[in-house]
């Protein structure tokens, strides 16, 4: 029996390796259909160390400020990651989400309903202020946000988890109506999610990997409360939800009268809201995905299979980095592109 246990223990990593290899394309990324993932539209526009000559040390400044902030408040990591995600899915990664509304003009993205719970903007403001004093009119808000999101997640690992290609400029248009239309909803089904991601040049593997960002952070019960107490309008619970997890969520989200308390919060990953690891996927495969959009991943065979592979933290972290590089390159504006600028203040166009 001891020999058999030893054999299984050594065999499991080999099996996992073979599964990952089967899903990999040239060792560089997953693909849903066996074809090599084509390089992003940003290639040739962005590059590593873009500010090496124009603002030496800019990326170090971003990292130092972000790590200091996250060390003091670990909840900032998911907050900054979410701001970056919400920015990129509307008009691309152009920092349009950072713009405040201006009287007499259209309401900005920041005031769209899906963005009302976002926070962490003041950290981007602080970084921008320091970089403007050091290198005026040089480092874009879009690049600052992209770097800050990466560094916030990377803090616990004490090293960058993925490369950030820089050289973005900032957009001048920000519309709440576009945010309401383009941002994936926590209540979306798989078909809707796949369509929205495909429109941004992201495939099923990216969809699953980026959903893994839910391994950190919290959510208000009002966002998913219908799954618990009124799934079909008859006071029932979503049958796809793990019963024990549903009971736990009801206890956390209900007031003394057993009614939903929409302002109550729970960790998005039941294994813990702080560690950036594969806990989200381990829980998901036990039907403990918090949102309808999480559970939706299990309704598609390819997505469910990818999620099962991502129960291995190494496989998840590697692909998450690749998918973040793709996401952070959606519809980027660079120097010379119409409609772009280097803002002096991330909240206002020049």
Swiss-Prot record:
Catalytic activity: 2 a phenolic donor + H2O2 = 2 a phenolic radical donor + 2 H2O
Alphabetized InterPro entries for the sequence: Haem_peroxidase, Haem_peroxidase_sf, Peroxidase_pln, Peroxidases_heam-ligand_BS, Secretory_peroxidase
Superkingdom field: Eukaryota
Enzyme class: oxidoreductase
Signal peptide limits: 1-27
Residues bearing glycans: 73, 189, 230
UniProt keyword annotations, A-Z: Calcium, Disulfide bond, Glycoprotein, Heme, Hydrogen peroxide, Iron, Metal-binding, Oxidoreductase, Peroxidase, Secreted, Signal
Ligand binding (Ca(2+) 2): 215, 269, 277
SUPFAM superfamilies referenced in this protein's UniProt entry, alphabetically: Heme-dependent peroxidases
Swiss-Prot/TrEMBL site (Transition state stabilizer) positions: 82
Molecular function terms from GO: heme binding; lactoperoxidase activity; metal ion binding
Induction note: Up-regulated transiently by a cold treatment.
Binding of heme b, residues: 214
Residues noted as binding Ca(2+) 1 in the record, renumbered to the chain: 87, 90, 92, 94, 96
Obligatory cofactor(s): heme b; Ca(2+)
Miscellaneous remark of the record: There are 73 peroxidase genes in A.thaliana.
Function (record text): Removal of H(2)O(2), oxidation of toxic reductants, biosynthesis and degradation of lignin, suberization, auxin catabolism, response to environmental stresses such as wounding, pathogen attack and oxidative stress. These functions might be dependent on each isozyme/isoform in each plant tissue.
Family: Belongs to the peroxidase family. Classical plant (class III) peroxidase subfamily.
Name by which UniProt lists this protein: Peroxidase 24
Species the sequence originates in: Arabidopsis thaliana
């Amino acid at each position: 029996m001891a020999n058999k246990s030893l054999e299984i223990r050594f065999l499991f990593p080999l099996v996992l390796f073979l599964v990952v290899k089967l899903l990999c394309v040239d060792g560089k990324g997953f693909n849903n259909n066996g074809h090599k993932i084509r390089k992003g539209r940003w290639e040739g526009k962005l590059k590593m160390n873009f500010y090496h000559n124009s603002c030496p040390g800019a990326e170090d400044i971003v990292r130092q400020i972000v790590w200091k902030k996250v060390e003091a408040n670990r909840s900032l990591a998911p907050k900054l990651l979410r701001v970056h995600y919400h920015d990129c899915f509307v008009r691309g990664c152009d920092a349009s989400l950072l713009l405040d509304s201006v009287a007499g003009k259209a309401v900005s993205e920041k005031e769209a309903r899906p963005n009302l719970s976002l926070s962490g903007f003041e950290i981007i403001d602080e970084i921008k202020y320091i970089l403007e004093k050091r290198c005026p009119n040089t480092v874009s808000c879009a690049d600052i946000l992209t770097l800050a999101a990466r560094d916030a997640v990377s803090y616990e690992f004490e090293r960058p988890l993925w490369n950030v290609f820089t050289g973005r400029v900032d957009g001048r248009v920000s519309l709440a109506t576009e945010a309401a239309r383009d941002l994936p909803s926590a209540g979306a089904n798989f078909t809707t999610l796949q369509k929205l991601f495909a429109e941004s040049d992201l495939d099923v593997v990216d969809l699953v990997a980026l959903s893994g960002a839910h391994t950190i952070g919290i959510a208000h019960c009002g966002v998913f409360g219908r799954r618990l107490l009124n799934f079909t309008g008859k006071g029932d619970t979503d049958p796809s939800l793990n019963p024990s997890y549903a009971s736990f969520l009801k206890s956390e989200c209900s007031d003394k009268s057993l009614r939903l308390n929409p302002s109550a919060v729970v960790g998005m990953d039941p294994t813990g809201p702080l560690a950036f690891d594969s806990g989200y996927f381990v829980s998901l495969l036990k039907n403990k995905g918090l949102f309808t959009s999480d559970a939706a991943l299990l309704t598609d065979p390819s997505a469910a299979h990818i999620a099962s592979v991502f129960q291995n933290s190494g496989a998840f972290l590697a692909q998450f980095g690749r998918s973040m590089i793709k996401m952070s390159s959606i519809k980027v504006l660079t120097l010379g592109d119409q409609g772009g600028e280097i803002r002096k203040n991330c909240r206002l166009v020049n």
